[in-house]
């Protein structure tokens, strides 16, 4: 299988960057990537998008199971759960057994409009960017109450989630990381926001506390995106935060610290991983290393002050600019 990779961080248009090859053996997928010769000749960027992908022609292979740069474009637990449920519904409708889904299925199952970062994917160079299902566009702000109800019903009984409810959730939620119920929402001005809904497993109003912590971070001088809080039920509040990888309709390339440091899920102090790895990366490839290292220190102190223990390398990341990466 060949997946054609496009980028839209070097110009206003989507440019063919290279091909991700997916080979399946014994039910496992194996990956390799090859840059487009034309893209290599024309690109003005000299910053690696993945520690395992260098600026030369020919196939390149990941040192781990997969390339981190493409893993960042995949959904995490919540989005994968929705895509799995969609496959079971489709299999039931077609009277067949559900397919075993692989990473490439999840990668291509994300709706293109709301995909994280500035990479886009096709399986046909003359076709549409995937996923292109018109039924799964980001819903308007006015549907938040309905989306919260759909996510609650899914958590209670995923078999309850029929095709109608699933479309309400999968269209905005499949592109996002993390395990909590969430969705992309389009604000009246056209900007994209992330809505994080209350969960049946919450022991307190998590959304309200996230908003409090977010506002405290801003008061302490940390760089945080715009946020809001809405309440639609007795279960708790919905916390909303503006997407930082969009500037209007322009896509901004984002990569997790996990990817750029060449780490894998579960990396911790036990294997030598630390904030110093992020500092070293910023010193070598950062556009504003001094400023970003100060920002990182503020995050460390703030997380300690508010007892934030959910602090791992997927919760830190970098934005690509023409001058380098920024925290």
Question: What residue ranges belong to the model's regions?
Answer:
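Phosphate/dinucleotide-binding and metal-coordinating scaffold of catalytic cores
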Residues: 1-327
């Amino acid at each position: 299988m060949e997946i054609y990779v496009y980028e839209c961080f070097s110009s206003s248009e989507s440019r063919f960057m290279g091909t991700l090859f997916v080979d399946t053996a014994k039910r496992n997928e194996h990956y390799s990537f090859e840059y487009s010769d034309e893209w290599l000749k024309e690109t003005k960027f000299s910053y690696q998008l993945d520690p395992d992908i260098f600026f030369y022609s020919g196939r390149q292979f990941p040192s781990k199971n997969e390339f981190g740069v493409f893993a960042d474009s995949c959904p995490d637990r919540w989005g994968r759960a929705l895509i799995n449920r969609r496959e079971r519904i489709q299999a039931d409708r077609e009277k067949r057994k559900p397919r075993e889904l692989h990473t490439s299925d999840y990668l291509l199952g994300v709706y293109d409009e709301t995909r994280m970062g500035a990479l886009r994917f096709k399986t046909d160079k003359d076709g549409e960017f995937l996923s292109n299902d018109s039924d799964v566009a980001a819903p308007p702000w006015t549907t938040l109450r309905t989306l919260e109800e759909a996510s609650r019903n899914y958590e209670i009984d995923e078999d309850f989630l029929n095709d109608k409810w699933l479309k309400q959730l999968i269209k905005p939620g499949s592109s996002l990381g993390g395990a909590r119920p969430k969705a992309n929402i389009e604000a009246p001005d056209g900007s994209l926001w992330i809505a994080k809904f209350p969960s049946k497993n919450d022991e307190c109003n998590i959304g309200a506390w996230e908003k409090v912590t977010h506002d405290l971070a801003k008061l302490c001088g940390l760089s945080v995106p715009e946020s809001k809080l809405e309440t639609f039920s007795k279960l708790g509040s919905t916390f909303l935060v503006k997407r930082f990888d969009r500037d209007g309709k322009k896509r901004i390339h984002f990569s997790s610290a996990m990817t750029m440091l060449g780490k894998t899920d579960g990396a911790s102090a036990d294997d030598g991983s630390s904030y110093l790895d992020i500092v070293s990366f910023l010193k070598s490839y950062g556009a504003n290393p001094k400023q970003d290292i100060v920002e990182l220190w503020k995050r460390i102190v703030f997380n300690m002050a508010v007892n934030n223990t959910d602090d791992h390398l997927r919760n830190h990341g970098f934005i690509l600019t023409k001058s380098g990466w920024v925290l």
